[in-house]
Amino acid sequence: MDWGALVAATLRLYQQAGKETWQKVQRSWWVGLLPLLYAPLFLLTARFVAPLGMIGGFILGLVLALCTSSYLYFLAGVVNGNRVRPQDLLESWRPYFFSVITILFFLTIVQYALALLLTPTAGAQALIALINLILLIILNPIPEIIYQGRSEGLNMLQESIEFLRDSGVEWFLPFVALAVFSFFFFPLPILMMPLQIGRLAFPALGVGGAFWASPGSLVSAVISAFLLFVLMVFRGFLFRALASGTRRQRVFRSRFS
């Protein structure tokens, strides 16, 4: 393997993904505002179902899955170059709902199993932290696999593992670099989200809580929502480029580009 050529091909791939992201974000900028619609919906639902206990948690999970499915629908349209319109909102909740709910159900089962099987000791907490870290890594490309991958159901986990085995370094490198930059120089929580989004917890729902409480909160929420949009579109293009071939194939193609 020509490592110099691989580095050059990878940098060119990042550059191309960034260029495509800039073009698509300009064309469909309004999609960046959608989290400001999902957040109140989720928070109002949480308030109403809070007294219902486990049933309330189930309902809240369904609403979370609907919001995430809708957002992925619009991301898919942007990344695939399709025309996306606000009118599509009514259709957007359905296409990826079952894929999203499958992953959320898997995570719920894992958390319940850990709570039942492990006693609350220091060693158990360390094991739980390790398992959660592994899940964070394995699930990271799941949003892109949902709307670009070839698998359904729990087979998406296998596809994610295969993708990370082949292209994990190239996938995580820009997001780790962004997180480090944010931690030391620009502490904006949303910049950490590309490393956490695989759990489908939809970070934009936290852009705010009551982001309408003050002008400053609203401005912060809008900025966070747009940054999330830009990062997710970049992830979409990066995933497509990395999933289209092996490292050797990318090096070979870069020689003719």
What is the predicted function of each stretch?
Residues 1-257:
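Hydrophobic alpha-helical membrane segments
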